[in-house]
């Protein structure tokens, strides 16, 4: 059994899509990043990489590499999970929190869970995603960015 923790944050900007958990969410701004900037999937990837002792997503998918420009974070997550499977691990459970003042994310969470479960080859009941605000405090509360925290438990297959 291995435990990993992941955290990521991206700035909200004009003229970008807002993609969280592989879901294109209607909003006037999106997250800035080299890839699709899916902060939730990046935090999940980091948690899994941490659990298997393989560094972080910056090591595996550097933002200096043009190959990852605009990359689909679902595909990056699938690659990370393949590393975990290669070491003999499967998802025990995953718990993630998205921190965003706006937009309201609750209607999109079921699809996020499905996307994540599919990418991780895990049952959806092992995946939990929730969203919270910061009551207008800090960068997330001011609408400057979105953060995500993840804890993952990996079990030997």
From Swiss-Prot:
Cofactor(s) needed: a divalent metal cation
Pathway the protein contributes to: Isoprenoid biosynthesis; isopentenyl diphosphate biosynthesis via DXP pathway; isopentenyl diphosphate from 1-deoxy-D-xylulose 5-phosphate: step 4/6
Catalyses which reaction(s): 4-CDP-2-C-methyl-D-erythritol 2-phosphate = 2-C-methyl-D-erythritol 2,4-cyclic diphosphate + CMP
One annotated GO molecular function: metal ion binding
UniProt keyword Lyase present: yes
Binding site for 4-CDP-2-C-methyl-D-erythritol 2-phosphate: 8-10, 34-35, 56-58, 61-65, 132-135, 139, 142
Disulfide bridges in this chain: none
Cofactor, free-text remark: Binds 1 divalent metal cation per subunit.
BP-aspect Gene Ontology terms: isopentenyl diphosphate biosynthetic process, methylerythritol 4-phosphate pathway; terpenoid biosynthetic process
Keywords: Isoprene biosynthesis, Lyase, Metal-binding
Enzyme class, UniProt record, top EC level: lyase
Superkingdom per UniProt: Bacteria
Residues that, per the record, bind a divalent metal cation: 8, 10, 42
EC numbers for this chain: 4.6.1.12
Keyword hit for Repeat: no
InterPro entries, alphabetized: MECDP_synthase (IPR003526), MECDP_synthase_CS (IPR020555), MECDP_synthase_sf (IPR036571)
Site features described as Transition state stabilizer, chain residue numbers: 34, 133
Record-stated family: Belongs to the IspF family.
Function: Involved in the biosynthesis of isopentenyl diphosphate (IPP) and dimethylallyl diphosphate (DMAPP), two major building blocks of isoprenoid compounds. Catalyzes the conversion of 4-diphosphocytidyl-2-C-methyl-D-erythritol 2-phosphate (CDP-ME2P) to 2-C-methyl-D-erythritol 2,4-cyclodiphosphate (ME-CPP) with a corresponding release of cytidine 5-monophosphate (CMP).
Subunit architecture: Homotrimer.
Name listed for the protein in its UniProt record: 2-C-methyl-D-erythritol 2,4-cyclodiphosphate synthase
Lineage, top ranks: Bacteria, Pseudomonadati, Thermodesulfobacteriota, Desulfuromonadia, Geobacterales
């Amino acid at each position: 059994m291995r435990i990993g923790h992941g955290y990521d944050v991206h700035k909200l900007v004009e003229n970008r899509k807002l993609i969280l958990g592989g879901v294109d969410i209607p909003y006037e701004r999106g997250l800035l990043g080299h890839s699709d900037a899916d902060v939730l999937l990046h935090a999940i990837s980091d948690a899994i990489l941490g659990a298997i002792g393989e560094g972080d997503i910056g090591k595996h998918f550097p933002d200096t590499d043009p190959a990852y420009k605009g990359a689909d974070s679902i595909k990056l997550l699938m690659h990370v999970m393949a590393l975990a499977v290669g070491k003999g691990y499967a998802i025990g459970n995953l718990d993630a929190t998205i921190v965003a003042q706006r937009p309201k994310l609750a209607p999109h969470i079921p699809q996020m869970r499905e996307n994540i479960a599919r990418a991780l080859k895990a049952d959806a009941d092992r995946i939990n995603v929730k969203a919270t605000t910061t009551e207008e405090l800090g960068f997330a509360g001011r609408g400057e960015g979105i953060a995500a925290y993840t804890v993952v438990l990996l079990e030997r297959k």
